Amino acid sequence: MSSKEIVNNRERLLVLAACLLITFCMGTVHAFSTLIQNIEMQTNVGRMASSLVYSTALINVTLAVYVGHILYRKFSPQVLIFFIAILPIIGLLISNSESWIGWIIGYGIFFGFSSGLGYGLSLYIVSSVTENEKLGFALGLVTASYAFGAVIFSMLYPFLFDHLGFKDGYICGLLILSSIVFIGLVLFSTSRVKLIQESSTSQQKDFNEVKILKLWLGYFLGVFAGLMIIGHAVPIISSFGGSTSTSITAITLMTLGSGIAGIYAGWLVDRFGCKRPLLTILLINTGAILALSIMTNISLLLILLVLIASLYGAVIAIYPTLVSHIVGSNLSAAVYGRVFTAWGTAGLISPSLAGWLFEKNNNYDASIILTLTISIVAILIIWTMKYSIKD
């Protein structure tokens, strides 16, 4: 008997609310753009060194999701949620040294790992207690909440810094998010839900490496364009003559669009399965990138940037459900941990490669053509993927 069969609706709602609070708070690690200039002034380092703090965080987000299935078996959700709440505070004590290495360890390692653990654990818990016919929407909500956390704290951090200064404002921000995670812990404990797990030996025989490779490549290529556009939105807008305020508005709309699209994509998955919506999203994405390569209007540019970022949000919202459908719920945490490394790899390669191509050509034409080609290959990989829902 699985957890889905013994959990009632009240318990599901409490668990979902807890996981949404956790992912909302852990998504704030991606509000790093509001910290970067203050970190540079505090530590007296340049842009490349300060950017390495966020790169370290991305690596540790990916690592936490990758090893998460081991932690889910060894520790109770309550213990893990406690550590999710406390690790950023430990990191805060280290980053308060006001040194570059302190930020690498405190923010990059401790907060980054906590963020990935919170995201992965929430996906695992929600997929364990949600009926299959509602799984896409539930996981879409979790992914969207992660994005919304970045949006809200991108606005909250500057407010706190203006009124309290950078150091005290950052302390206040982390105390707020840690407190919210503890509220999530209380909600989960109140639900009294017990997660039932199958033995890993009975699961191992169902692994299909070819399927996992296709899932990995589909994810890597599917998010490549979105990560490149998100990472270079400000310089792309600047190259078209856009102002700083235009860039800030675009970034906010892109992140909001990503979250909203994730919710809608989850709703579509519950009605049409994963493959058809995913193919449709990738086709629209390819068309948007093609339009991006030929247009010259700043207003159209903003629309296309928001569209591509929103489609990226839809892809990352669909993928946990896609993995669960293809390999089964018992294997989904372990397999998704492996597949999620595609996101981490794309997150490190895509913006860096786009920056290198820009320096070589002094424009983004080569980067856009590359992402267009990659998006077409992503469509072909998903098209050839055998898809059926496995119980």
Where are these regions (language model features)?
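Hydrophobic core of transmembrane alpha-helices in multi-pass small-molecule transporters
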Residues: 102-117, 300-314
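C-terminal transmembrane helical hairpin of 12-TM major facilitator-type secondary transporters
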Residues: 254-258, 269-322
